[in-house]
Amino acid sequence: MDRTVVEACFQGQPDLERTVTGQRTRDANVSQGGSGAGKVIDLSLAGQGNFVAKRGFLIEMVWFLIEAALINNKFNPVSGLRIWLLRRFGARIGTGCRMQHPIRVKAPWNLEVGDNCWFGVNAWIYNQAMIRIGSNVCISQDVFLTTGSHDLAKTMDLRVAPIVIEDGVWITSRCVVQMGVTIGRSSVVTPLSVVHRSLEAEGVYGGNPVRFIKKRFPL
């Protein structure tokens, strides 16, 4: 193959090492397998990316034990105890909130919740970055809120971004809300949806990937 043609194939990909002889490509973390094999990212080289820990190892371990014993425990029905413990570890939670059992919170110091919010059974708040939840929000059963992902194309480094859920939102059962998303005021997300982008206010959304269905409040 002509060398000029080969190099043209790699225009716009400055991070890749270009090798004309043998017609192979790779970067620092991506290796090319044998004949007919695809690329594989070396997970041993993955880093922390833009994640910055806000608490030391000891605090994180203490929280891990408390979460396992008292927060994520179906035999502890006391919502007030969960909220009290979360506040002791840095969560900002308003009045009138209810947390069903069990529930998981990875980092209470990265959690802000307004007033009169409901959290259903098995809700999972995986907040490596900040999650801000407004007032009068309902997070239903088995909802997964995750502020983390990975650089899937090159290094698998950790990537984090905050989630904002505005006042009056209802996220129904078994939905996933991904990093960097803002869900607008009084919106509804229907069951089993994957929210990969920000949503405007007062809409009903559903699906995987999520799409607009209709306005929540008819004119």
Feature locations, PLM:
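Terminal amphipathic alpha-helical/low-complexity segments used for targeting or macromolecular assembly
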Residues: 1-91, 168, 186, 208-219
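A short, terminal or domain-edge coil/loop segment
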Residues: 52-55, 150-160, 187, 202
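A generic secondary-structure micro-motif detector
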Residues: 71-72, 155, 173
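Residues at secondary-structure transition points
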Residues: 76, 80, 84, 88, ...
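Left-handed beta-helix
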Residues: 95, 100-101, 106-107, 114-115, ...
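Conserved catalytic-core motifs of eukaryotic protein kinase domains, centered on the activation segment
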Residues: 149, 155-157, 181, 215-217
